[in-house]
Amino acid sequence: MSSPRDFRAEPVNDYEGNDSEAEDLNFRETLPSSSQENTPRSKVFENKVNSEKVKLSLRNFPHNDYEDVFEEPSESGSDPSMWTARGPFRRDRWSSEDEEAAGPSQALSPLLSDTRKIVSEGELDQLAQIRPLIFNFHEQTAIKDCLKILEEKTAAYDIMQEFMALELKNLPGEFNSGNQPSNREKNRYRDILPYDSTRVPLGKSKDYINASYIRIVNCGEEYFYIATQGPLLSTIDDFWQMVLENNSNVIAMITREIEGGIIKCYHYWPISLKKPLELKHFRVFLENYQILQYFIIRMFQVVEKSTGTSHSVKQLQFTKWPDHGTPASADSFIKYIRYARKSHLTGPMVVHCSAGIGRTGVFLCVDVVFCAIVKNCSFNIMDIVAQMREQRSGMVQTKEQYHFCYDIVLEVLRKLLTLD
């Protein structure tokens, strides 16, 4: 098993929690930009269903059918044990919702009954025990060699040099679709846009959504994803259309709705087992859910109103990524990624954080590496990130996130060598 290539370290704030309040929400200039590291590939398939503007009707939910609580302990300054939300949803805005102050950093979790356990902690522990299909003396030696190379890279700050090389790499690409006046308000950040060559088209008219097809080739196998921003209130309908058109059965959400008092992603799913989320073309039912210590599982049935066709979708929301930086422990994220991989059955896995490049890039990179380890394949973290950046600008957004990719792989390899 061979390894990756170079990098450098110092905490850098990324999109997941650093925006200031906009003063004038009537101008495009109020949309936040990255002020950070930014950056086509295979031909992507086309889909059906025309994209039309759809209306959200969450306001039809009577309050006596549900109660929203924040079950997740805060990882930022304020730490209320529970926050009950009873007010109406705030209207959409011209600029990114990330500009809105919105209270403490919490994951919105419905207080529901009559649910069934979906997975046990024991099963998740088993999934975290990543083991190659072949684990003989030769393979153990290869793993030891790989571990030694990665540890030397970390000690010598080669990882930071790798990241710098990725930042300096010129990746010419066009963002014409995302920059069209009619599409600008669909972007959470004005400089985080999909390449025209890899953007996900909606419907026969190939309408716009801020999402990119990502195809990563490693050891002769292709891994297929959709990397996208967290939905805005105005793009929730488009988001579900994308999920259905691509026949995706897993959504990996790596953000809380609110972090550091800032809205990072709008609540795009139903909040009650009793009432579906009514959209113009789709009806989304919450059928089951499970709140774990570090992520939430939600099971949806999404019905296309015009045909009655129903589509099962599992959403996995990781809730332990801190407002700034990376998780203190890799163990919970390892379990999360492995469970997402086990759950994936159809279509590209849809992965999003807030901007759809930072934490999303970490997820994709580490998922590919874990699959490589299981299949006794070599991997190269720098090459994986380079492939992603050719298809969506700025994937794995910060030096800290890039280093975390190495840290989590090192932890898995070290545990692997302790197995009998």
From Swiss-Prot:
Keywords: Cytoplasm, Cytoskeleton, Hydrolase, Microtubule, Nucleus, Phosphoprotein, Protein phosphatase
Catalyzed chemical reaction(s): O-phospho-L-tyrosyl-[protein] + H2O = L-tyrosyl-[protein] + phosphate
A biological-process GO annotation: lymphangiogenesis
The Tyrosine-protein phosphatase domain, residue ranges: 159-412
InterPro entries, per the entry: NonRcpt_TyrProt_Phosphatase (IPR052074), Prot-tyrosine_phosphatase-like (IPR029021), PTP_cat (IPR000242), Tyr_Pase_AS (IPR016130), Tyr_Pase_cat (IPR003595), Tyr_Pase_dom (IPR000387)
Class of the enzyme per the UniProt entry, highest EC level: hydrolase
GO molecular function: phosphoprotein phosphatase activity
Active site: C353
One GO cellular component, as annotated: centriolar satellite
Signal peptide (UniProt feature, chain positions): none
Keyword Hydrolase set for record: yes
Post-translational modification Phosphoserine, affected residues: S76, S120
One Pfam family here: Y_phosphatase
PROSITE patterns recorded: TYR_PHOSPHATASE_1 (PS00383), TYR_PHOSPHATASE_2 (PS50056), TYR_PHOSPHATASE_PTP (PS50055)
Residue segments, region Disordered: 1-47, 68-108
SMART domains linked to this entry: PTPc, PTPc_motif
Compositional bias ranges of the Basic and acidic residues kind: 1-11
Family, per entry: Belongs to the protein-tyrosine phosphatase family. Non-receptor class subfamily.
Function: Tyrosine-protein phosphatase targeted to sites of actin polymerization in response of varied extracellular stimuli. Has tyrosine phosphatase activity towards various tyrosyl phosphorylated substrates.
PANTHER family, A to Z: FERM AND PDZ DOMAIN CONTAINING 2, TYROSINE-PROTEIN PHOSPHATASE NON-RECEPTOR TYPE 13
The protein's name: Tyrosine-protein phosphatase non-receptor type 20
Lineage, broadest ranks: Eukaryota, Metazoa, Chordata, Craniata, Vertebrata
